[in-house]
Amino acid sequence: MKYILSISCFVLSGLGLYAQPQIKIAKLKYGGGGDWYAAKTALPNLIAFCNRELGTNIAPEEDIVEAGSKDIFLYPYVFMTGHGNVVFTPSEAQNLRNYLISGGFLHIDDNYGMDKYIRPELKKIFPELELIELPFDHPIYHQKFKFPNGLPKIHEHDGKPPQGFGLIYEGRLVLFYSYETDLGNGWEDQRIHNDPEAKRQEALRMGANIISYCFTLAF
């Protein structure tokens, strides 16, 4: 199945991205017992930020899409998060592979605790690929907002630096994995984590860069 949304619906101008018609993005529902539903206010806040700062026309609420659903092909950007176990069935892994090689983009944000579970599951999707750390000069860090040192550190857990990993298929970044940063928590309502506003803005700006990259460069 070919990806049914075309990047041609996005018009670039000096002011940003203008989308016609309205585009929807989604959160991935997966099996294994992990809390795929975490960070409930994150995407609506990121969407509002992107619509305001980038001029996108993204629907204000995200959809929920299951890993094995053909509806995943409706979304140019799918977000995945959680703290725990992740399991993809063979058919789900094949569906995700088809989605990604057909033009889709998956952003995985480790909400702390997912890393040891997600890495073997990604091998089910792309057994031939390895996660690679993206260099700081990668375009995903240099959209409207500049991050010369890569991902910002939003929440501290064990003192490790934030890292951005990717899967690259035939020269195209199809999956971005943000690790040791907690971007999604930074997108949430301020009252939830009591993050300083400066940290929230860092997280939202980096999230906007990911959306911008997905919409304009990844296809």
Predicted feature residues:
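Sec-exported extracytoplasmic/periplasmic mature domains
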Residues: 51-55, 101-104, 123-127, 215
